Amino acid sequence: MSALALASCSSTNKVTKDSDNATRPDNAYMDIDSKFLTFSNDQRATINKGNTFAVNLFKTQIDKQSKVLSPLSVSFLMGMLANGADGDTQKEILKTLGVDDVSLQALNEAYRALLNSTATNDKQTTINIANCIAADKHFSLKRDFQKTVLGMYDANVESLDFSTSKAVDKINEWCSKQTNGMIPKIIDQLSAADVAVLMNAIYFEGTWEAPFEKAETKEENFRGYTRDIKRVQMMHQEDDFSYLSNDIFEAVTLPYGNRTYSMTVLLPKEGVSIEEMMKQVDAQKIGSLYRDMQKCVVDLKLPKFTTSTEVVLNDAVSKLGAPSIFNGTANFKNMSDANIFISKMLQKAKIEVSEEGTKAAAITAGMLSLIHI
């Protein structure tokens, strides 16, 4: 499973092999993922195809600020939308996800397997993936659609009165509960045209297999994109890690708990920007990292940080191949007989990295609204 949370953080990082003491300012790409969950060959192939969407979506968000993003959360939402779409709209969604050569049933089964995989035997790692549809009590969703999203995505449909503020409160309460309070709300209000909100929530909490010693955390320089320097708490340890170095970047993997999940950090080489690095990175190369990494002693410095991001994804998803879901040409006839479209797709995400481990959460919401002709 790729990209539970992705972050681009500006920092003065140090990822050096053996006794090399060179420290340099640059920016890092971080990926929380799992390599050891069990899927069928078909499910694994479908999930791997979706990893291309994950990397491409993250690339649309690279700018001059630190970002945290969960492409997996967006993928679950898009999967539910694919089941409600028809015609060209459905084709666009599947192509954007990189699974246009896969049946919708196969896609659903892959997401079902991902949901089932969250029940691990690792007592040091918690992961929760949840889906939900909040619908106005006057809006009708087709029964077959409701049956599919419940059976394949565990997405219950909750009927609410969208004309009252209690509907907003209920939606935000669900978000807070599913993310253990990390994302307390996703929306402030509902418009008169809104008829439903499709939501995915992801929560991750993991303890490092090798925690950082708090006594080793020191205040050190932190350099951002604008080259300004500020002082931050920098964690430090020297230990055996899976490590790789090439002409573009260095990479190190930090496992959690019993190694089911891990964080991989990519640090551009001196003189290489994160934008230049990401141009050279695709899903296939990220996948090959784990095959090419070797165990060695790594002198690692990593900022102790908390960062959060709120982003509207309409433009990004449109550019990646699914513009029709956001305009009057949207076809969601497998979801409802009403003329509806996604007026807004937004995500809130947050990550906390400390000496003990990592907490990360994301909510992705698709606002379904009536098309006024």
Short names for language-model regions:
Residues 64, 104-269, 291-368:
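Non-catalytic, conformational "gating/processing" segments within enzyme and secreted inhibitor domains
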